[in-house]
Amino acid sequence: RACGLPQAPLDDLAAFHVIFGKTVPDVSLNAVANLGYAQGRWRAQVYAGDTLRSSSEVIGLKENSSRTSGVVYVRTRGTNQRGEIVMDYVRWVMVRKRDAEAAAPETVVPELKRALTVADLAIPAGLTFAKYDFAQAGEPHRLGDYAVGEVIDHVDGVTIEEAEHMMATRLWQNTAKVHFDATFREDGRR
């Protein structure tokens, strides 16, 4: 609240994964590969108790040279219970063709920005860091503490086991087969 927000918002990546997870059954449940993301914007804060929904628009299609698969480009919008867009992003996914002999769709590859501009970003109304307590947050480093080319060794590594991988994907409601079925991939890996 000291930062001008009504309460602590959910972590942005938690909100992203919930919105992303809702798209999996319709976009990438049986994907060969999730290829990339672009133009991701968090446009409004998400708070505990919000209801999130996702909708995706197909904005591009391209058959691969193998003619057995292709790339689908989608723009996904996540909204809250008030219909406010809380985030949007573009992603592209490689999927198999239903019929390898089917004619290729018209190729449409969307033009995507290489990077977002400051004008593309949304700053929550009322947000201020004038009273933010950096010491209480446990983060002593500021912009002037870093240098270009500096290497930071993050010593606290962690091993993610299969059970944790599956638990995380279930938590975010990501039902893509590759996360749960070791027989889905030819190499037997997830």
Where are these regions (language model features)?
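Hot-dog-fold acyl-thioester-processing enzymes
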Residues: 1-37, 98-190
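HotDog/MaoC-like acyl-thioester-processing domains
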Residues: 44-133, 143
